[in-house]
């Protein structure tokens, strides 16, 4: 991250404290590894944001219902950062700058609400784009394609990468989302671990007017008439096997959820900030019986479940994965209507779960621990 590097180069001993908030934001939002100097910058930057030195960031936290003492690197990367980024994607980045330069609470709150509204618009556009991508896959019979090339001319080019990432997560295939720009077609790609996207693009570079990227992500410009030839060429040269399309997750240890108590959650807190390069520990347990649940969020994209452990305890699990895929899996494994039964509080469905442990505040109540599931079986897990 250039911001963090510049701070360290300019003044290695006496870093300007008033810039730490922005260095922390930049480091996390630029997906830098939270190690060494980066870790220190983010940790100290979080402290300053919590103290409310910057009126704009304080207001942005308030409109997003983030309590200062609960602020973490997660909020920088997935709540505050997207709000600041949305205005650059859909309007002008000057509005984010105006927020950060606000001197009065009134000005800051006005700007923060506007940015939050823009981010909600960005989220809605993203959901619509994902739905349209699903329809495109069905309409163009792409279920057998190893590399998915999806043309959505009506999608705003600034959110093509976000949509590509979401579609990649859902199907676990390399994905290109293409949109219609002023000077031809533009697009973003997101890949899986087994597919080097930039190298694959280099093999068919004659179809691009411009391209760049790395193993897991890329950007491109091309002619509209070359979309189908590109799709055919990428799939013809692709050497991925069926095993490559099976999601895999590496856990730290298999551990009963009952072991996750206040003390353990407190010890994990000492390891923060978590993020790229310093991930939150992952655990797994088999035989968790899902009894009841309900969907949450403006777009109902996550859910809370009550589960019973093999040891006889009851735990709360918050699921941030693909609810549609989870519902289909339940209906296939336990019979049609199983998903409906679970949300009606009549579930009795054993599942294996990969989870994380952390504290969570919900409706003013702090719960310890809350276990966040990433994937439900069938999933390949390794320690």
Residue ranges and their predicted role:
Residues 1-9, 376-380:
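Short, small-residue-biased leader/transition segments that mark boundaries at the very start
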Residues 11-232, 254, 295-297:
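Hydrophobic helix-and-loop "lid/oligomerization" segment in the mid-to-C-terminal part
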Residues 105-113, 117-151, 203-375:
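Mid-to-C-terminal polyanion-binding domains and interfaces
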């Amino acid at each position: 991250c250039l911001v963090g590097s510049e701070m360290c180069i300019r003044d290695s001993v006496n870093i300007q404290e008033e810039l730490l908030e922005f260095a922390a934001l930049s480091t996390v939002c630029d997906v830098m590894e939270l190690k060494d100097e980066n870790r220190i910058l983010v940790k100290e930057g979080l402290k300053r944001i919590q103290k409310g030195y910057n009126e704009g960031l304080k207001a942005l936290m308030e409109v997003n219902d983030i309590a200062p003492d609960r602020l973490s690197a997660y909020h920088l990367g997935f709540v505050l950062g997207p709000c600041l980024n949305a205005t650059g994607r859909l309007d002008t980045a000057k509005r984010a700058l105006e927020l950060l330069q606000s001197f009065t609470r009134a000005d800051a709150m006005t700007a923060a609400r506007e940015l939050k509204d823009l981010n909600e618009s960005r989220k809605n556009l993203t959901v619509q784009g994902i739905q349209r991508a699903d329809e495109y896959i069905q309409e163009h019979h792409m279920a057998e394609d190893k590399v998915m090339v999806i043309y959505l001319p009506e999608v705003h080019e600034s959110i093509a990468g976000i949509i590509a990432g979401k579609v990649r997560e859902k199907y676990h295939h390399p994905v290109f989302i293409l949109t219609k720009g002023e000077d031809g077609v533009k697009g973003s790609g997101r890949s899986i671990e087994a597919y080097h996207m930039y190298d694959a693009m280099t093999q068919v570079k004659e179809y691009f007017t411009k391209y760049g990227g790395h193993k897991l992500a890329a950007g491109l410009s091309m002619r509209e008439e070359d979309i189908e030839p590109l799709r055919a060429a990428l799939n013809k040269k692709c050497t991925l096997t069926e095993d490559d399309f099976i999601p895999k997750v590496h856990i730290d240890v298999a551990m009963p959820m009952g072991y996750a108590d206040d003390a353990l959650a407190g010890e994990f807190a000492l390891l923060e900030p978590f993020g790229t390069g310093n991930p939150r520990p992952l655990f797994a347990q088999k035989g968790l019986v899902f009894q009841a649940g309900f969907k949450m969020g403006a777009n109902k994209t996550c859910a809370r479940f009550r589960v019973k452990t093999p040891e006889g305890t009851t735990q709360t699990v918050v699921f941030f994965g693909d609810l549609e895929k989870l519902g289909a899996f339940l209906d296939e494994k336990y019979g049609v209507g199983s998903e409906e039964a679970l949300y009606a509080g009549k579930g009795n469905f054993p599942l294996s779960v990969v989870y994380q442990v952390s504290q969570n505040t919900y409706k003013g109540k702090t719960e310890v621990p809350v276990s966040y599931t990433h994937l439900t079986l069938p999933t390949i897990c390794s320690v």
